[in-house]
């Protein structure tokens, strides 16, 4: 697949010394989280031409396993995480990213359901930006309670008559 090939290429090269901007994506290899990452690779040539930016990638599980990253010294590090990442793993991940990319802007790329913000509050003091993969078309729905913790659980709970507390 094209996406896998582009990911492998981005994981195999360090940043060049002449890059104006260096974007390191620390990502999960699974299909749904990768759908958030593919556009960065698809438009990598345009990012380089227009902004002098290089895009590289590292596997989240390798970083958490303390495997050395090929690309370090990024100016921006954008990372994904599992929704159930432990506090210890989250703190260790961010500490490692900051140590290997001093002065970098740290961004969380949240690939979860549109109304699932379970990690936003605990990441707030640790990162510079929190980016959702997608948002609800009708943004007024964000102020309304759901049955369960996301719009997806709300839809299933209502459809199948599952009793969940409003949140």
What does each model-found stretch correspond to?
Residues 1-120, 124:
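N-terminal pre-catalytic "stem/leader" segment of glycosyltransferase-like enzymes
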Residues 96-167:
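Catalytic core of nucleotide-activated saccharide and alditol-phosphate transferases
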């Amino acid at each position: 697949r094209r996406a896998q090939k582009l990911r492998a290429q981005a994981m195999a090269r360090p940043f060049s010394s002449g890059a104006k901007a260096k974007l390191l994506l620390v990502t999960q290899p699974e299909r749904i989280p990768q759908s958030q990452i593919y556009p960065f690779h698809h438009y990598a040539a345009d990012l380089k031409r227009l902004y002098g930016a290089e895009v590289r990638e590292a596997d989240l599980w390798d970083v958490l396993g303390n495997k050395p990253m090929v690309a370090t010294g990024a100016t921006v590090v954008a990372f994904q995480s599992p929704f159930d990442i432990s506090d210890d793993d989250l703190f260790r991940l961010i500490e490692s990213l900051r140590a290997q990319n001093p002065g970098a802007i740290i961004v969380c790329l949240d690939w979860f359901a549109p109304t699932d913000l379970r990690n936003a509050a605990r990441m707030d003091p640790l990162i510079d930006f929190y980016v959702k993969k997608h948002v609800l078309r009708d943004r007024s729905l964000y102020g309304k309670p759901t049955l369960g913790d996301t719009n997806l659980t709300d839809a299933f709970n209502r459809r199948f008559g599952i009793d969940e507390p409003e949140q």
